[in-house]
Regions:
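P-loop NTPase motor module signature
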Residues: 1-287, 423, 607, 616
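Active-site proximal loops enriched in glycine and acidic residues that flank catalytic Cys/His/Asp
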Residues: 2-3, 31, 133, 196, ...
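Composition- and surface-driven signal marking solvent-exposed, interaction-prone regions
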Residues: 13, 144, 273, 407-410, ...
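A short, compositionally biased
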Residues: 15, 389-391, 584-588
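Second RecA-like catalytic domain
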Residues: 90-91, 96, 148, 153-156, ...
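A short, flexible low-complexity segment enriched in Lys/Arg and Gly/Pro that occurs
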Residues: 155-165, 368, 373-374, 565-581
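Short, solvent-exposed cationic patches
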Residues: 182, 418-440, 614-635
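Charged, non-catalytic accessory extensions
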Residues: 396-398, 404, 466-693
Length: 693
């Protein structure tokens, strides 16, 4: 197994199998660390400077430099070429190495320089191989004993939310850094220059994350279903497939018609069985089987072979029909590498041969013209990437994403596209369509009718600020046709309105202060009795249970103002039976009679409840008033004649004995018309001035 894998985890999975380590024949490698890279410093600048240093420090050595991707390799090569030209340096040969190169170009990077083929015999010429992680484990590069490592790798990560794989630049693991450094010690002692510090080395993850954690799981899911396994939990894994990616894979296979759900779980359909006989991604096997079912084996094989290989065409040419014309020999493109043409055509022939042994479920209905065929086949493979042009420009995809065509005037004239590849645009400008072909809209009524879904939509229209119900014909997020409905089932309508209320909050409903106080009174009794006998009337609980208490009353709500017409007090009061409402009024009354004879409102929105009353109205009251049968003392806000708080207390007797006299001293001169007796416990409580008593 590879040195970059976690051997202990594999051993544990295999019942604690013994681990045998073979170090191989290696030579010592000196590790030379750099400084931590500054936030605005380009990795290319650091790489170019370090390669120059490595060449000067090791004038008889060739260098292997690890960069994250093709773009960085090309830019690094350009800057080194300028340096070599400006300095008139002789004998330094730059060799890129990445997967998109031809076999001949890759061989130039791997093979020794002419005259340097004998081990241990070096001339003055030096080779600089600028490589992706393709050179980390799988290739042996002759003559290299110096490595310059950027510490970065470009990884393909599948996003199950949108069903697409994107490239992300990440730091390598410790295991990968050791593997890369080891390239310098294959044939003699070497050096490894790392573009990061020793401290940063210690912070790297021990191992790279397993591919299964970031991959498109559709091929795996199809294979497991072929074995009769419809859930990852039925197997033992080093790393269990992520649930989100697995569910996306199942959804994709279902949309391709490869699987169906039965009582005991997911099973392959006859169409899915045919797909499993083709050693390609399920999207392409579906394309091939659909092509065979329409008697279009050759065009389907050609398109599948095109989608299987790296695209050598310029990013400015997204039209797949142009590529197909070149592959089929209908047009010529001298700049396209002949090796790519040969490989792709050979692969197409292999697909044709494999399809002769595949039995499609039957001939499909509806005729398709040769002009419609590429769009149809591509839409079969990528139904989630069917795209429609927006009025504002660009395209919207069936998966809900937006994307643009850059410099594609001919292709951009089409209202509908079948899209094969979409890439993220830097700078937050959305996605870019990299390869696509025009799609005939009439196919949605014929050959692609299975992709069209009928859906009844009941929702709150934000723009119109009203409830709407309509029948929609959709392909994913793309609405083909809308038909307004006069009525929908009450359950669907209430569900839509409840969803809107949850988004906007309970403030949409016609609350009154009295109703808010009623809910607070119920909440108080609920807290005293430990949740027994009384409903939860908190905002959180009411929002969570809208289906139970509000849904039956929403049938007449269509406009925003209709919410205000609801008799919310009656609806909320219905949460408490009549007998309990009488108990509520007794245990948690809305008002309290104070010594002056006034009936003062109790505020239950605070904890404890608050009684705000003028100080003079409480003369003679020694005991703090309570509610809930004496269990909850009220918090007394004693107010000035002007209604401003003078004292807040739950100990009324203690206030009269102590703090009252300080308050009296401060307030008597300010409010001389009101009584300020020396002994408030024997004074007559009043809400009047002294002259009116």
């Amino acid at each position: 197994m590879s040195a970059t894998l976690d051997g202990s985890a594999t051993s544990e999975l295999l019942g604690n199998a013994p681990v045998v380590k073979s170090e191989g024949r290696t030579y010592p490698v000196d590790i030379i660390y750099g400084q931590a890279r500054q936030p605005k410093e380009r990795v290319i600048d650091r790489m170019v400077a370090t390669i120059k240093r490595a060449l000067e420090d090791n004038p008889t050595s060739s260098v292997l430099a690890f960069l994250p991707g093709q773009g960085e390799i090309r830019r690094t090569a350009d800057e080194l070429s300028n340096w070599i030209h400006d300095r008139k340096i002789q004998g330094v040969h730059l060799r890129p190495l990445f997967g998109n190169l031809s076999i001949e170009e890759q061989q130039q990077a791997i093979a020794p320089l002419p005259g340097n083929k004998e081990p241990g015999k070096y001339k003055n010429d030096q080779k600089v191989v600028l490589a992706t992680n393709i050179a980390e484990t799988s290739l042996t590069i002759e003559g290299v004993d110096v490595v310059v490592d950027s510490g970065l790798v470009r990884e393909a990560k599948f996003n199950p939310a949108i069903g697409m794989t994107g490239l992300h630049t990440a730091k390598i693991s410790k295991a990968s850094s050791i593997q890369r450094a080891g390239r310098a010690g294959r044939v003699r002692p070497g050096k490894c220059y790392r573009l990061w510090s020793a401290d940063q080395q210690q912070q790297l993850a021990a191992h790279s994350s397993a591919e299964i954690l970031n991959a498109d799981l559709a091929p795996l899911a199809l294979q497991l279903l072929q074995w009769g396994v419809d859930s990852p939990s039925e197997l033992s894994w080093l790393d269990e497939p992520p649930r989100g990616a697995w569910q996306q894979a199942i959804d994709l296979l279902s949309s391709l018609g490869a699987i169906k759900q039965e009582a005991h779980g997911w099973v392959l359909t006859e169409h899915g069985q045919a797909m499993t006989s083709l050693p390609v991604h399920p999207r392409l096997s579906h394309l091939l089987v659909c092509g065979a079912a329409r008697g279009a084996i050759k065009p389907a094989a050609l398109l599948a072979s095109l989608l299987s290989d790296r695209d050598p065409f310029s990013r400015d040419h997204a039209d797949i029909s142009h590529r197909l014309d070149i592959l089929s020999g209908k047009s010529n493109c001298p700049s396209i590498h002949q090796g790519w043409l040969y490989r792709t055509r050979q692969l197409a022939q292999q697909f044709e041969q494999q399809l002769f042994n595949v039995k499609p479920p039957g001939q499909l209905a509806y005729l398709i013209t040769a002009e419609q065929l590429p769009g149809y086949l591509l839409a079969c493979a990528y139904p989630d990437r069917i795209a429609r042009r927006r009025y504002s420009g660009g395209y919207q995809l069936a998966n809900g994403r937006s994307a643009n065509l850059v410099g594609q005037q001919h292709l951009a004239k089409n209202t509908w596209l079948a899209v094969a590849e979409v890439s993220s645009q830097t700078g937050g400008k959305g996605d870019t369509i990299r390869s696509a072909v025009k799609l005939d809209e009439s196919l949605f009524e014929s050959a692609l009718s299975d992709a069209v879904q009928q859906q009844t939509i009941a929702e709150w229209d934000k723009k119109a600020n009203r409830f709407i119900a309509e029948e929609q014909q959709k392909i994913g997020a793309l609405v083909l046709q809308r038909t307004r409905l006069d009525s929908v089932p009450a359950e669907a309508k209430s569900a839509a309105l409840i969803q809107h209320i949850r988004k906007q909050g309970l403030t949409l409903l016609p609350w009154t202060p009295a109703l808010k106080q009623w809910c607070a009174r119920v909440s108080l009794l609920r807290s005293i009795e430990g949740g027994q006998n009384w409903p939860d009337t908190s905002d959180e609980a009411l929002l969570a249970t809208l289906e139970e208490w509000l849904a039956p009353y929403l049938n007449e709500v269509n406009l925003l103002n209709d919410f205000k017409k609801l008799n919310l007090a009656e609806i909320i009061h219905a949460l408490v039976p009549w007998e309990q409402q009488q108990l509520l009024n007794s245990l948690a009354p809305t008002h309290l009679s104070v010594p002056s004879g006034s009936s003062i409102c109790i505020d239950y929105s605070e904890s404890p409840p608050v009684l705000a009353v003028k100080l003079q109205e409480m003369f003679g009251c020694e005991q703090t008033p309570t509610v809930v049968a004496g269990k909850v003392p009220l918090l007394i806000h004693l107010l000035s004649p002007a209604g401003r708080p003078l004292q807040v207390t739950q100990d009324l007797a203690g206030f009269w004995r102590s703090s009252y006299h300080d308050v009296k001293k401060d307030m008597k001169g300010r409010y001389p018309k009101h009584p300020w007796p020396d002994d408030p416990l024997i004074a007559v409580a009043t809400r009047k001035t002294k002259n009116r008593m």
